[in-house]
A protein has these predicted regions:
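Conserved ABC ATPase "signature" region
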Residues: 100, 104, 111-129, 180
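Conserved ABC ATPase signature
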Residues: 133-137
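Conserved catalytic motifs of ABC-family nucleotide-binding domains
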Residues: 154
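Conserved ABC transporter NBD signature motif
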Residues: 60-68, 76
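Catalytic Walker B motif of ABC-type/P-loop ATPase nucleotide-binding domains
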Residues: 158-161
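Helical segment within the ABC ATPase nucleotide-binding domain
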Residues: 173-182
Length: 182
């Protein structure tokens, strides 16, 4: 087995009186592509939101690169890239403005922001749209921007919650290729 990136132990989460997930255990190792499968309402997004520090677990532990997410969330989150079901895009910004803003949120030193933005735009094939408002781009390109914000800080672990949802067949193929590259 490879190097452990994420370790989840006895993870449980309850919404009011209803358990969404109960006693979940798994480990994610370096260089793997993993998926959470299950029916609607099975708790997949709940698990991802907990692993990314968006939601606090009711019970159990999550370790990111050996760091306990509950005890040291800032340090653990430095290793995580996250694209939620609904990408957190600011439609009133250009692609470049948005990624500059995101880079500052992701602990990238000011002197390196420009380089990081250019690099991630190249990786996600969105450089030619850098001066365009996000709201004027197709769903596929908006999804690429969402992925770009998730990987701009070169995280060890990337979580993509339904990254191809709502895209046409050609866009789905493009996004799958992009995911394989990252």
């Amino acid at each position: 087995m490879g190097e452990s990136i994420v370790k989840v132990e006895k993870l449980s989460h309850r919404y009011s009186v209803q358990w969404a997930v109960r006693d979940i255990n798994f480990e994610i190792t370096k260089n793997g592509i993993y998926g959470l499968l299950g029916s609607n309402g099975a708790g997949k997004s709940t698990i991802m939101n907990i692993m990314c520090g968006v939601l606090k677990q009711t019970e159990g532990k999550v370790y990111i690169q050996g760091v306990d997410l509950a005890e040291n969330p800032v340090d653990a989150k430095r290793h995580i890239g996250f694209l939620p079901q609904k990408p957190p895009l600011n439609m009133d910004l250009t692609v470049e403005e948005y990624l500059n803003f995101t880079a500052n949120l992701r602990w990238i030193p000011a002197a390196e922001v420009s380089r990081a933005v250019k690099a991630v735009m190249g990786r996600c094939d969105i450089t030619h749209f850098r001066k365009r408002l996000i709201r004027n781009l197709s769903g596929g390109y908006q999804q690429r921007i969402g992925i770009a914000q998730a990987i701009i800080h070169n995280p060890k672990f990337v979580v993509l919650d339904e990254p191809t949802n709502g895209l046409d067949p050609n866009q789905i193929v493009e996004i799958r290729h992009l995911i394989q590259e990252i």
